[in-house]
Amino acid sequence: MSKIKVVHPIVEMDGDEQTRVIWKLIKEKLILPYLDVDLKYYDLSIQERDRTNDQVTKDSSYATLKYGVAVKCATITPDEARMKEFNLKEMWKSPNGTIRNILGGTVFREPIIIPKIPRLVPHWEKPIIIGRHAFGDQYRATDIKIKKAGKLRLQFSSDDGKENIDLKVYEFPKSGGIAMAMFNTNDSIKGFAKASFELALKRKLPLFFTTKNTILKNYDNQFKQIFDNLFDKEYKEKFQALKITYEHRLIDDMVAQMLKSKGGFIIAMKNYDGDVQSDIVAQGFGSLGLMTSILITPDGKTFESEAAHGTVTRHFRKHQRGEETSTNSIASIFAWTRAIIQRGKLDNTDDVIKFGNLLEKATLDTVQVGGKMTKDLALMLGKTNRSSYVTTEEFIDEVAKRLQNMMLSSNEDKKGMCKL
């Protein structure tokens, strides 16, 4: 079977611990046997980030801007315990945060729905996609500890010297406290809005945008005004043509409505809100192991995909001891497929897109049709006996068998069409 040619490169960002183990298996068994692809490889393991003073994370981000598509393995964000474990030079920032700040764009998280797998929220029949603004707010904030009595002020001085703002924020008592200053930019918010509206059009789904503008009357209301103005100027007629809607909601109201709904919509959220709610949605649909995460810029030209979960440290410890593991690799497989499909769309190569879709179907059918699954999914079905689940590698092998049969069948169909 000849390999499918991928015209332009894909940036590959390797990661840490158990996800690094399954990453290698996916690449060797599901990707490279079928694709002739130039992978621009960057090792984002915690050891390599420490060795390069985190330069490798920045380099991989700029490579993504250059080539347009990246696929990322889960990585460790170090805390004090990890600093000691790996003897790190410093507590390096989250790689995802660094990547998001360089690329900009919006992070969209979407559940992978397998009908056989029960949902914690049973009436969520359709996907709920969470769009998370990938810039600013708490994630670029400056925070300080206040250790004595004094005044906290907020100052702004314009570059032209014509405007100076000096506001008293709070007068601290002797016991001190904490303070934080955070920001966002109109350009970034507009890009966030554009990416959200574009995805709603592409998926033909209603879009909700959430803030707490009743409390943050300048900060959050600026988000709302930018969204509303862009919608009225550029998207209102397009939405009406598709019979979909856009609506701003207070976040507390939206979360309550989301829990009562059947799904089938997109929620655009500010950075922190999206971070929290995407995990809630993932759990409601079953598992973080069944959640995709993509970052896309407003112009659609820069794209990065990854699994929404972490590095699965507990399983990695078992792997290190030579013990059997049963780690769910579905979200990591979908990280690869979403990057492959995007690459195919940008390159206008239908066979690359078709391969990505076939690999997704092979993965889902392995569970839904074949009944082969990892331990976490078996437990969700109430099955606890050892025969009800397969190991980490066995699951990927089952997907590989199903994919091979689908690829052979697809090639036979092509030959039949040629004879006709």
From Swiss-Prot:
GO terms for cellular component: cytoplasm; mitochondrion; peroxisome. GO terms for biological process: fatty acid beta-oxidation; glyoxylate cycle; isocitrate metabolic process; NADP metabolic process; tricarboxylic acid cycle. It is an enzyme of class 1 (oxidoreductase). Its cofactor is Mg(2+); Mn(2+). The record marks Y139, K212 as: Critical for catalysis. Its EC number is 1.1.1.42. One of its GO terms (molecular function) is NAD binding. InterPro entries: IsoCit/isopropylmalate_DH_CS (IPR019818), Isocitrate_DH_NADP (IPR004790), IsoPropMal-DH-like_dom (IPR024084). Binds 1 Mg(2+) or Mn(2+) ion per subunit. Substrate binds at T77, S94, P95, N96, G97, T98, I99, R100, R109, R132. It catalyses: D-threo-isocitrate + NADP(+) = 2-oxoglutarate + CO2 + NADPH. NADP(+) binds at T75, I76, T77, R82, K260, G310, T311, V312, T313, R314, H315, N328. May function in the production of NADPH for fatty acid and sterol synthesis. This is Isocitrate dehydrogenase [NADP]. The gene is IDP3.
